[in-house]
Structures are given as structure tokens and as C-alpha cells.
A protein has these predicted regions:
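Conserved small/polar residues in nucleotide/adenosyl-binding loops
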Residues: 150-156
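Conserved MFS/SLC helix-loop-helix module at the cytosolic interface between two early adjacent transmembrane helices
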Residues: 56-79, 83-86
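Residue-level signature of mid-helix packing/kink "hotspots" within the transmembrane helices
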Residues: 49-53, 57, 138
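Extracytoplasmic
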Residues: 12-28
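Small-residue (Gly/Pro/Ala) motifs that create kinks and tight helix-helix packing interfaces
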Residues: 59, 140-148
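Paired small-residue
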Residues: 93-101
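Cytoplasmic helix-loop-helix junction between adjacent transmembrane helices
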Residues: 100-129
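Helix-breaking motifs and short loop linkers at transmembrane-helix boundaries and internal kinks
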Residues: 35, 67, 88-90
Length: 160
């Protein structure tokens, strides 16, 4: 059972890494369609980073109150909803609004699963955990590239 949980955590960290590099890969196509300056991606990144910091600092209280499983479930759901919000956002400010749950979800799941692995597994698994985040961060643009360069029925601003 411990191996099963570890595999699930590794998969969660792959999925945690996937959206982290998508904005940078998609922004060249999104930016002209949204009609915003190139540096607006930095605003979105800062909102996500701010949410991540807030969630990370609140993680201890959340984990004690709700447990790792519930925090992870809510965090992954928030991140998935944020990605859906990115995909459906009609304008930049809707993207900025979706960036809030993106950061909060990413920060809480990151802190929660790191804590769980640190408490229940050997130290080497922490290195593997972050390796799998890197796999996800690498795969994000790889998955996005064929979508963004084929002329599917998706508008260019809805690539993410």
C-alpha cells in the first residue's frame, strides 16, 4: 500500500509540474490574441507565485485541520478549475482571476505532499518527487506544441 501511495504522489507531482511551464510556452500565441503587452505574462506569473506563497504559508494549519488527502483533493480540483479558466478566459483579466486558484492550488498540494513524503518515506523519495515535477514541467510544452501549431478549431488565445 505504501508503494501505491508513493506512485500516486509521483503522478500528482507530474501533474503539478505540467501547468508550471505552459504559460511561457503558450504566451507567444496568447499575447497578440488578448491584445496585451508582452510583459503581461509577468503579472500572471506573479499572481500565481503570490497564491503559491499564501497557500504554502497556510499549509500547516490546513493539513492539521483537514488532512493531506482532503487538502490534496481540493488543491488538485482548484488547479484543474484554474486551467479550465485559462482555457475559457475571454480576456486578460479573466486569466488573472484564474491565476489565483492556480497559485493557491499549486502551493497547497506542493506543501502537503512534500510534508507527507518527508514524514512517511525515506529521504531519497523526496529527490524522486521533485524529479517527477521536472518531468511534468518538461512534458507541458511538449504536449502543448502540437496543439498550438496545428490549426485545430481552438482559438489561439485558448491554447493553455
Amino acid at each position: 500500500m505504501a508503494t501505491f501511495f508513493l506512485c500516486m504522489i509521483y503522478a500528482a507531482f507530474i501533474s503539478l509540474g505540467l501547468p508550471d511551464s505552459l504559460l511561457g510556452a503558450a504566451w507567444p500565441a496568447m499575447q497578440p490574441a488578448l491584445g496585451v503587452p508582452l510583459d503581461s505574462a509577468g503579472v500572471l506569473s506573479m499572481i500565481v507565485a503570490g497564491g503559491t506563497v499564501v497557500a504554502s504559508l497556510s499549509a500547516d494549519r490546513m493539513l492539521h485541520r483537514f488532512g493531506t488527502g482532503r487538502v490534496t483533493l481540493v488543491s488538485v480540483t482548484m488547479t484543474a478549475c484554474a486551467l479550465l479558466g485559462y482555457a475559457l478566459a475571454p480576456g486578460f483579466w479573466w486569466l488573472a482571476l484564474a491565476a489565483v486558484p492556480m497559485g493557491l492550488g499549486a502551493g497547497a498540494v506542493d506543501a502537503g505532499l512534500n510534508n507527507f513524503v518527508a514524514l512517511h518515506y525515506e529521504a531519497r523519495h523526496m529527490s524522486w518527487l521533485h524529479c517527477f515535477w521536472g518531468v511534468g514541467a518538461t512534458l507541458g510544452p511538449v504536449i502543448l506544441s502540437p496543439v498550438s501549431y496545428t490549426h485545430l478549431t481552438l482559438p489561439t488565445k485558448r491554447i493553455v
